[in-house]
Amino acid sequence: MKDFESIKFQINELVNKELEVLNLKVYEINNLKEFENDMIQILVEDALQANKPLDFDILIKANDLVSNKIDQIIKTNQKYLLEISSSGIEKQIRSQEELIKALDQWVYVQLNNEIKKVKEFEGYVTKYNNDTNTFSFLFFIKGQKKTLEVMWNNIKFIRYAVRF
């Protein structure tokens, strides 16, 4: 969509305001091409518990709340599709603030540098120490319980994970 970046912020503000009543917030907004049409994809998550599963009914309500409002911002004759979806159960944790909200959650972590011979793992985010600015993780290697203290700047990639 032409000039999408110029209206993305407005869409984000409007959608977040409308979704407050459903206790949802925007995770990400994308402009995609689908079958030669522009698609605005709005990924949402629960406002209080970022990794809470969302059911189809709440996504339908979210779509109903915002679809006409977005038309007021997008002043074009160009056709577009609107998709409101869950941000997903294994979404990326993009900031230190998001990781603080992920306490007691199961995550997959890749580190920039090895710590105690560990470069990647799946485990629980057990605590955040504000004084040292470190996160504690609990995980298992070959059945042995391990803990690791990691600073945010040593995390290369982190996302929620599903524990099997």
UniProtKB/Swiss-Prot annotation:
Compartment(s) where it occurs, according to its Swiss-Prot or TrEMBL record: Cytoplasm
Pfam families the record matches: RimP_N (PF02576)
Keywords, comma-separated and alphabetical: Cytoplasm, Ribosome biogenesis
GO BP, one annotated term: translation
Top-level division of the source organism's lineage: Bacteria
An annotated GO cellular component: cytosol
Tagged with keyword Nucleotide-binding: no
Keyword Cytoplasm: yes
Chief location of this protein within or outside the cell: cytoplasm
Record's function text: Required for maturation of 30S ribosomal subunits.
Family: Belongs to the RimP family.
Protein's name in the database: Ribosome maturation factor RimP
Organism for this UniProt entry: Mycoplasma capricolum subsp. capricolum (strain California kid / ATCC 27343 / NCTC 10154)
Gene transcribed to yield this protein: rimP
